[in-house]
Amino acid sequence: MSALLSADDLNDFISPGVACIKPPASTNTNTNTTTTDSYNENGEVEIQIDSQGNPLEISKIDGKQIQTNQLTPAQISLADCLACSGCITSAEEVLVAQHSHQELIKALQSPTKNKVFVVSISHQSRASLAMAYNVTIEIMDKLLINLFIKQMGFTYIIGTSLGRKLSLINEAKEVINRKTEEGPILSSICPGWVLYAEKTHPYIIPKLSTIKSPQQITGCLLKNLTCEALQIDKSEIYHLSIMPCFDKKLESARPEIYDNENEEDKSISISVPDVDCVITAKELITLLEECPQYQLIPPQPTQPTLGGDLDLSVTEIYKQYAPPNWPFIEYSWSNDSGSSSGGYAYNYLNIYRNDLVLRKGYDPNKFTINLINGRNSDIYEMRLIYDSKETLASAAVVNGFRNIQNLVRKLKPNTNKSMNNKINPLVARRRARMINRGKSESISQEIEIEIADASKVDYVEIMACPNGCINGGGQINPPTTTTISNTTGLPQKEIEKQWINKVLDKYNTIPILFDLSLPSTSSSLEIMKYIEWSENFEKHFNISNDRLFKISFNPRENKSTGTATTTDDNNDPAATALLVGSKW
C-alpha cells in the first residue's frame, strides 16, 4: 500500500464530495418506456435512497420530481473498478511499482543510473504547492527549480505551457474539422473520464477527441529536444511529470506508439515512454518528508541557492534551466484563459472565431460569448454569437461524474428519436407561463432562463473531478484544523471549498502572456507560429503528426467475465496497467 493511503481517508482523492461513479444497471420494468425516455432527455436523473433503504431512480425537471423507479441494489466488486482515483486501491500495485516517489528516489540514488533527469510541472500543481506553503507562484517556481536542479540533480525543468498550447490549438482544429458530425466532440485529456468511457460506455468512444493531453505532448517534445541538446539517446532520459491527478499515471502507461527506429515499419518498436514517472503535488510533499536531505524551503540563513540565481528574475531562471533549444521560452510557464483545467471549451470558441475572421472576413468586433449556467456550478455552456443573433459555435464544461453520467445518458443511442425530439409537456407549459407573464422574447433574456445542455453543443470539456483539475485527486489537502483564516467552527467540507477557491486564486495569478482568446490578427499569427514550429519539429525529428498529437481509444471489457478485449494486451504491461481494475 502507498504511504498516502490509509483506512481513515480512503475518500480523500476526490474532494469535496465523493460518490460512487459506477452506474447501476437499468432494470426498469415500467412499460411506459416512451415517457421515461422523454423525461431522461429533458430532465436529469438522480439516484436516492428511501426511508427503507431501497435505491430509487428519480426523474426530475426543473427540480420537480416527475417519476420514480425502484432499482435493485448495486453490486460493487473490485472487478467493477474504473481506477477513477476515488480510491486508488485497484491500481495500487502497478502504479506504485512504476509511478511513485519511491521509484523516483530509487532512480536518483541508483549508482549505475546513467540517466539525465528532466521534469515538467503542471500549472495546477504549482498553484497547489504555492497555496500549501503560502507563497506566490513566482516564488514557488524558483523554489521548485532550486529543489530539482541544485538539490536533486535534474538537468532541465520546464512548465507544461508549450504542450498545453499545442494541445489547445490542435483540439480546436479537430473540433472545427469534425463540426458537422452528429452530437458533440468530447475531450479526452482526463484519463479518469476516458477509462470510464472505454470500460462502461463504448458507444461514446467515436465521439472522443483524438488529441493528446499536455502531459504526453510535453513528454514527446522534452525527450526529443533533450536528446538533441545533449547528444544522447532517448533511453538515457528520465522524464518526471508532476500532475494534479493520480490518473495521469494511467495515461502515461497507455499502450501507444512510443519511439520507432523505422517509421515505415511499426513492428520495430522501442519501448521508450514519453513520461517515465508521474507524481502529484501531494506525493512530492511525501517525498520531502521521507528525504530530509531535500528541502523545498531552504533553511535560513545559509540557504542553498541557484548559484545566486534566486535573485534573478523568474523569466531569466526559466530560460537558464530549460533545454537550450526549447521554443517560446517566454511563454513556457504562462497560463491560458478559460477554466482551470486548461480552458479547452473557451479556447475552442475563440480559435474558431479567429478562424472565421481570418478566413471568411467576419468582423471581429461583432462577436460575443454568452454564458448559460447549468443545474450546478460544475456544468455550464458557452455560445459564440455573431451580430447579437447568430449562434456560430457552442461548447460546454462538464465536471464531476454526476454530471458526466447525465451527459452520457443523453448521448446514448436511442431508436425512438422522434419521441426524443418532442418538447416535454412540463417544459412547454413553463415557457407558456413565461410568455403570459409578459417576459421578453429577446435573445439576451431567453439565454438567462435557459439551462445548459452539454449534449447539444459542438464540444464538451470533461473532467472527472468536481471543480476540474484544480481539485485533482493529487492536489494537497487543506488543513483539518482552524489554521485557515476565518474558518473557526466551519464544517470540514466548507473549509475544503474555501481552500479550493484559494488554490484557484493562486492559479489565476499565473500570467497569461499569449492569450488565445484575444480577437486580433496578432493572436492568429501567434497560433500560426506554434503550428509552423510543430510542423518543423516533426520534420526535423522524423516524427509523424499522429505520433506527436494523436491518441486512440478502444473498448476495455471486463476480463473476469471471460469476454475478450478488442486489443491484444495479454503481454502488454501498459494495457495491464489500464485493465488492472478488472483483474482484481
From Swiss-Prot:
* GO terms (BP aspect): iron-sulfur cluster assembly
Sections of the chain in a coiled coil: none
Gene3D superfamilies registered for this protein in UniProt: 3.40.50.1780, Fe-only Hydrogenase (Larger Subunit), Chain L, domain 3
- Keywords from the UniProt entry: 4Fe-4S, Iron, Iron-sulfur, Metal-binding
- Which protein, by its recorded name, is this? Cytosolic Fe-S cluster assembly factor NAR1
Single annotated GO MF = 4 iron, 4 sulfur cluster binding
Which residues of this UniProt protein bind [4Fe-4S] cluster 2?
C190, C245, C465, C469
Native source organism of the sequence: Candida dubliniensis (strain CD36 / ATCC MYA-646 / CBS 7987 / NCPF 3949 / NRRL Y-17841) (Yeast)
